[in-house]
């Protein structure tokens, strides 16, 4: 506790009402946010002589000031506490790192509705189904539905531009409403069945399809009956793969496990009795935090995140009880205007779901701990191999990627003692150099990385360069220039490919002395170097391919006078890609919003050249 903070004097001013408190350190940064039913009683507990909790002792030792906000009720205090935690991200709070909104399937409100992936604010009119645990689950579901229901998934601009059916129609995954190859009645019937399917009512869909197949067969419409038969077969195959409970309804099932400083909350999303998917969360947990506080903090931030598109079900099952369960349920009801039950003691199928979630959480933590131990061991071996007197906390690796000098991209990936730190990854688009000049590309990337670097900046202990002595010399020269006024420059090591480019035969080169050395193929230190090198290569080539594709899609259009970014985007979206634009007639080009007949002729002539 700061010498300037007088706890006794402060506590005399605190009320016994419910509210929220913010603790500040000497730098005026919020280090902890908490809530209390009785502020005076709760805050007094921090300043007792014998504090058993090590984490609380550390927290109190840094307190320089405390702000208190009184609320009308404990429920209001819970909601405000969550808002403050999100705002300040305090050091001593358990922090849920989940800033992504959840994806949904959108069934649009169009004359011929489309099924689409959606993430973010629900601005488009239509029905939203979800949330799904991740984007992959949505795409998998959409791919699955294409095989069962011939409903379009193209965007509206593409739909409007069609004068003939696309490939999806040819392979039986769309009924081509864009060119009137399906009746309005039949299309809407498929939309209705898809809606029931997304609501989990598979048996109802099956009954309708069987009835329609039998009716079509009776009417001797055998081709139509065969189509219904194929739908039934596909639907039955899907239903067999899904674990369905007719009694469970909508639930979130949370398995919580915490060991050796690593916490995992594994969520099963149960919607309409069906497992929609699952997702694991790894909150940032301060050392020596009690399990009950970890669980409470996770639930608070997860369900009171006002920015999320998440829909909370009426029932939440958790593997462990925690304090203030009832208060949290009240806070959710207040925030979302929906009654929620939080349960731990359940039987039958619910208990089975809970065991499954807990098993997944336990396995996830054990896997992370194993990975963490492996990474830590490899760091120790690397320190030994290069005879480092200091502990390596941060490593970076640079790589260059291009195709014959086109669309050059440099990557910088970062590893710490827990493995890849993807939030710190960076890509650099390289410009103004001779195409294919890897030395100039490396110089530009390293210069941009360390431009205006300071003592307090994120400086790596080791900087790996994926390349030979030439690129290493360039990088070393830039680092020497940038760190001339600093005494904490990184150690540079080049990673040159071995004979036949075989893994395990790499030659390692120190940047300063240019002394080369190698490590045994089975060395854990070498495996760590290979890991960061391969990750740097992957990150560079992914960025290069994306840039190259974007360039090739637009470069042809960029040379046409009068076709700026907006018109290029409209042409590509409306017609469905560069090849479609090249193959379009003048009249088809003129249908694109913002393209006059005269401009269409100009574009047509330029592309046909």
UniProtKB/Swiss-Prot annotation:
- Report the residue ranges that make up the GIY-YIG domain in this protein: 16-94
Localized where? Cytoplasm
Q: What UniProt keywords are attached to this protein's entry? A: Cytoplasm, DNA damage, DNA excision, DNA repair, Excision nuclease, SOS response
GO BP terms in the entry: nucleotide-excision repair; SOS response
Question: One GO molecular-function annotation for this sequence?
Answer: excinuclease ABC activity
A cellular component term from Gene Ontology for this protein is: cytoplasm
Could you tell me which residue ranges the UVR domain spans?
203-238
Presence of keyword Cytoplasm: yes
The disulfide bridges present are: none
The job of this chain, per UniProt, is described as: The UvrABC repair system catalyzes the recognition and processing of DNA lesions. UvrC both incises the 5' and 3' sides of the lesion. The N-terminal half is responsible for the 3' incision and the C-terminal half is responsible for the 5' incision.
Q: How does it assemble?
A: Interacts with UvrB in an incision complex.
State the name under which the record lists this protein: UvrABC system protein C
Give the organism, scientific name. Shewanella pealeana (strain ATCC 700345 / ANG-SQ1)
